[in-house]
Amino acid sequence: MSNCKTIAVCNQKGGVGKTTTTVNLGVGLAMQGKKVLLIDADPQGDLTTCLGWRDTDSLSVTLTEKLRAIISEQEQNPFDGILHHKEKVDLVPSNLSLSSLEMTLVTAMSRESVLKNYLSLVKDKYDYVLIDCMPSLGMITFNALTAANSVIIPVQAQYLPAKGMTQLLGTIAKVRKHTNADLKIDGILLTLVDGRTNLAKSTVEALRENFGSHIRIYRSMIPAAVKAAEVSSKGTSIYAYEPNSPVSKAYASFTKEVLADGRQKERLHAAHEHAR
């Protein structure tokens, strides 16, 4: 499966639905028959707890151990400690130990590529790798962007995101310049959209005004819902918890948009190979 696509779900602002999006996109892709690996790249471990592993401190193997082994060039079984969720996604979990690794990375050789080097050992087994980034633009997030083919940016509809987005786009530009020239922005996903669609419209307009039409905004928008907040305590996706809810339908629609991107990429790749 060398056609594996790695997507970083990224926004340095917290509370925009990054983890919820990673879970529901991941499970949505798995429901469509794709093999999916989720990476919790946040020391808070929200993705890990969202999927039902509450006591993150008791996990003996997390992303920290995987990356430490790469840094120290120790032999490792790269699949050891990968957790298997009942909704058919795999997870490299995280806990607070990841924040201490951030300091180690600063002095490591090829420090921006440690996560990329780890993923090269496992990604042939998967169609998609989704990285849930922490809400900051430090070295771990830089690693995620270096390892990724593309970025999905969840943005809260009630929040005019001009300033934060400028920072994030600046970081993406830096990554492109130094460590990952091919990094693409797949699009912006509007989340927590309430019934007042005018507010969502004004956010879309502000995004277009500030960032031009070159950044795509997904047609699917994720509605705000109390139920969606409840799901994170259940250890399941929205599909398992409330399959007919507006949030579930919105994430299913978003998953189809992401799959359509993947199919287009495959067609372009095939055409390129044929032309050679």
What annotation goes with each model-predicted range?
Residues 1-276:
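P-loop NTP-binding core
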